[in-house]
Amino acid sequence: MRLSELTHPNQLHGLSIAELEDVARQIRERHLEVVSTSGGHLGPGLGVVELTLALYQTLDLDHDRVVWDVGHQAYPHKLITGRYGDFNTLRQQGGVAGYLKRCESSFDHFGAGHASTSISAALGMAVARERRGESFKCVAVIGDGALTGGIALEAINHAGHMPNTPFLVVLNDNDMSISPPVGALSTHLNRMRHSAPVQFISDSVEERVKSLPFMGGELPAELDLLKGSMRRLSVPKVGAVFEELGFTYMGPIDGHDIERMVRTFETAHKVGGPVLVHVVTTKGKGYPYAEADQVGYHAQSAFDLITGKALPSKGKKPPSYSKVFGETLIKLCQQDSTVVGITAAMATGTGLDLLQKAVPEQYIDVGIAEQHAVTLAAGMACEGLKPVLAIYSTFLQRAFDQLIHDVGIQNLPVTFVMDRAGIVGADGPTHQGQYDISYFRAIPNFTVMAPKDEAELQRMLVTCLQHQGPAALRIPRGSGEGVPLLDEGWEPLAIGRGEVLCEGDDLLIVAYGVMVPAAMITAQLLQEAGVKATVINARFLRPLDQALIHPLARRIGRVVTMEEGALAGGFGAAVVESLSDQDVLVPTFRIGIPDQLVDHASPQQSREALGLTPTQMSERIQEHFCLNSQPSLVGQEAPQALST
């Protein structure tokens, strides 16, 4: 069957193993063709092609439910659920999303983007099914990295106490998350995966049974359970963790052997309670470069299929904020042995892979465990260490209670570096870093800041480490501004003090973080239109520099705030509340992300859609204050502050 003709997963029913293997070949070809052109997640999807086909041949996707954890491995799923023709629009504005979205397809049974949620969601569907007296199957597909997440373990604990609820968990064990997984559970899975006795027993049972004359060289599906029982008798540790938690354990099995997986899944569906099928796969399967470098090819920008190398970008770019952070932290760690970098399975993305290589004794990876990471850091701070937790803004949301309860209330000196803060682009709404400003505003004792460029990032990191309390620093995705960097001798900033970058009497612009350079360009455009603006680099969200902002707001009489974050409870709201509390009641216009989700697109396309480019902001400001009809406001008296 041609992949282009496969528009419904139920078309897999009745295909022979050879035909399924041919479909698998076509999926890999299309997967590589599109991702090499437009970029996207590569290794995860290549690793689950056979798993997807084998599982779907045993299900009726018009009725049964499958929840893919995270969703970045679901490109094969998308290719066989009616999106083959549009797949070349992957992760592009208005095109196929890089993750699962319920609004995109009826076969995307649960949306995701963050790890470890699949078992809870699929179990919830099973509970609803039982209450309604229905009979559809519920399946969660989760990776070994995501299985270390607390919510996944909580769900397994719950499911194990529902012995009469049919429910299948497929453990996609590729010994990777984005980076290699860590922890005791991962070590246990690794022992199971590579256990020589397990492989010997499995192979011996199958070969002996197949050799019986009346078997015809085939192994009945029902004997898979017998194989599992024999393995557990001979090697008690295999599957013991899951068996003790109430699951029937089956595996480990080869995740690229379609025939064996089909038999195993058919058997698993017949078990009357929770079942875990342990499938061992190779991340990046079928593309040698991705198999050899599973971290580097987890996700890729456009690349050359023949050489595997990324296509050259246009022009030389400054180093990314993540790289500047990582290199600066290395030097600070070398100067102070009490500084420790912590990541939650995102070393490469946050720049901490540099620290891991340079100063490994001052580096910790806790796995996909954001809540634990925050409280671990709190405990370390209690004993005099200086933990620096580098984490994506969107993932830190998962540890909001720990930020309050374990760090904020106790006023502990923990530094949080929130990478990918603001608009991130093609990963879409699950990954936009638009909420951290709002949620950090509400936590007492925190000092919160954002740099205007990479040099200010260096100074802010030093400021955080010298501060005797919790501090949070947000940095955007992508390259810096290209300003000169200092190798050492960074001076800390005065806490809660901003700076004036340019002066004008018509308008006050107060910008935060990545929006400061955009504010300066906007001010230039306004000046060309006859409107002269003062621009403040706020630097700090908590505490806000009221001593700088309030007098200028009173004198100038028009205030614009700029942020790349949610307007609801955001930086602009903080400025407005501060002015209002001191009876500085001047017209104010807040620019940021409105109360909406930001869908997948390039960062530039997202900013254009939100009206956040300098040209758009200049036009919006003039329209809001009715300035575009006035050739110049220079010399005019500013509006007086209102009184109550």
Swiss-Prot record:
This is 1-deoxy-D-xylulose-5-phosphate synthase. SMART domains: Transket_pyr. Its cofactor is Mg(2+); thiamine diphosphate. Keywords: Isoprene biosynthesis, Magnesium, Metal-binding, Thiamine biosynthesis, Thiamine pyrophosphate, Transferase. One of its GO terms (cellular component) is cytosol. Homodimer. Its EC number is 2.2.1.7. It catalyses: D-glyceraldehyde 3-phosphate + pyruvate + H(+) = 1-deoxy-D-xylulose 5-phosphate + CO2. The keyword Magnesium applies. It comes from Prochlorococcus marinus (strain MIT 9303).
